[in-house]
């Protein structure tokens, strides 16, 4: 039985980490693509040479032409300029929008049936542009955001309570930025909602508020520490979880940037919501009930995303006709 082909557009820190994780999980053969000659080829060879030690048989290829991604089952897009200290995800808009147009054209020509996961920032606007540029069905194009943001929230909570991360569930909705919405009432430790843990004295509301704020600024915290780049281990792990759910038809419920066209009262917008990912892509959008402050925060986050999408429309009006 032939292995799936997984194409990685962009061979920087996230791309290289993705390739290694995919190999370790034996999800398929990997094509690393980059416009920088030698970089994808070098990383592909380096990772391939680790396979005898780690015990996996995936094949790795580096390429500078989109032809190499032909027939890919999954395409993960990391191409673009990364964040630097003092730079917001939104500052990247005009630069990375052009990249998405080029990448979308390449996917449309060589891998039109793939499941596409976008990681490039500003995430929600870039996945919207990528879907428009590629012309692919919206259910086959998603953005990696909520899985990462929820993982950060889960880690901070597990650290706070000194419990296993496996026993912590958490959902972060909305845009992948400072307006994201970590949902405290839908987050639990061994099934116990966080508000109940406040009542029994495990933590305080003030401490939970601090953890929520840290989650919102999780990416910036790492950018400021690294000084020369942004996070790559956790983003790569998050994208691999999404790809695995698709390739193995696991039907996991994951928070991702998904295309909404009526759900949550929102149209023609990509924003973070829980979805079921299976062999058909996004097989179901889970509409949870949002009320009060949660709904206000979600609407504010959606408004921020729509502002970025509107900016994309002004910069590249031809996207609307695709």
UniProtKB/Swiss-Prot annotation:
The catalytic residues are 176
From what superkingdom does this record's organism come? Answer: Bacteria
Q: Which UniProt keywords are listed?
A: NAD, Oxidoreductase, Tricarboxylic acid cycle
What terms describe the molecular function in GO for this protein?
L-lactate dehydrogenase activity; L-malate dehydrogenase (NAD+) activity
Q: InterPro entries attached here? A: L-lactate/malate_DH (IPR001557), Lactate/malate_DH_C (IPR022383), Lactate/malate_DH_N (IPR001236), Lactate_DH/Glyco_Ohase_4_C (IPR015955), Malate_DH_type3 (IPR011275), NAD(P)-bd_dom_sf (IPR036291)
Which reaction(s) does the protein catalyse, per the Swiss-Prot or TrEMBL entry?
Answer: (S)-malate + NAD(+) = oxaloacetate + NADH + H(+)
Name this protein carries in UniProt: Malate dehydrogenase
Species: Rhodopseudomonas palustris (strain BisB5)
Q: What is the lineage of its organism?
A: Bacteria, Pseudomonadati, Pseudomonadota, Alphaproteobacteria, Hyphomicrobiales
